[in-house]
Amino acid sequence: LLHLYSWPITSGGALKRNLVLALLTLLLLLPFCKKKEPEEPTQEVFFEVKAGESTSRIALRLDSLDIISHHRLFVISAKLKGLDRSLQQGVYRLHTNMSEDSVLLMLSRGAIATVAVTIPEGLRLRDIASRLTKAGVVNQDTFLALCRDKKLLLEFNIPFGSFEGLLFPDTYSFPLGILPEDVLRVMVRRFFEVAEPMLREVSLDTLLILASIVEREAYLEEERSVIASVFLNRLREGLPLESCATIEYALPRHKERLTYADLRIPSPYNTYINTGLPPGPICSPGKASLEAVANPKKTKYLYFVSKGDGSHYFSQTAAEHEQMKRKLNKERSRNGA
């Protein structure tokens, strides 16, 4: 640090003054040159640097929370290192009794605190909002309201009434304090990043709605593209999709087994009584289901029925389908199912 005080030596008095100033500066900065040993157990503190906040104000707040011990030394160090205008906005995970130098380094590098959240495939908006809320990222009610916000939907040119299906399943690292609308934007942009190549071949509504149905209907990876082909074939033939997954979406609560009465509920999502696509997606599909719809297996299948073990029987005709259903029902009766 002596090079900071390289004035010309014109007299003994000037030399003495320069040496005294240099020694004083070294003494001031001494706490930054060694790690401070905490006198008592440290406690984790979440500290927010606000937009436009001055270094002196930040230092005073750090001192008041016992994160640092010398707010003046923090300010001096920031100025000497040219970092007094480089402290970045955000929420930081700090602890009490840190050295001023360590805190300064974290705040100038923008080493903000983050939280990781994994969103699996096939979740609905309410389930995603619940996971984000449990992780401390958003408030559930606020987030769900934003998922139906018309301005945000218009921002992404979404043709549906909500962001159902568009919050892409992935593992995210969100900074603490992130705005809920920015959480939504991150997840929607991730969807379009993944789906962009597929949207060159298939419209958004067809891709997303069918992929969401495939996500809920398919259990085995190798069957996704076959199931997608069944629904696409039925659309081309003008037949109802007849997806149990859409009935489950329309029901007010989850049921382990659907009844014939459920298949007649009056809902635009009831694909047993309505032809064409339902009004929107029924969950957030993963990449595999999106790809299955964009590149379906070439088949003539129009029907499938669950074997009960996750796999399905596929049929080309209604007669073959009914025969297979009777066979499965007999097997289940014998097994007491």
Give the positions of each predicted feature.
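Bacterial extracytoplasmic/cell-wall-associated proteins, especially those involved in peptidoglycan
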Residues: 130-138, 144, 152-337
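Bacterial N-terminal signal peptides
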Residues: 22-29
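Leucine-biased recognition of intrinsically disordered, low-complexity hydrophobic segments
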Residues: 1-4
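Signal peptide-directed extracytoplasmic domains
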Residues: 34-196
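Positively charged n-region of N-terminal signal peptides that target proteins for export
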Residues: 15-18
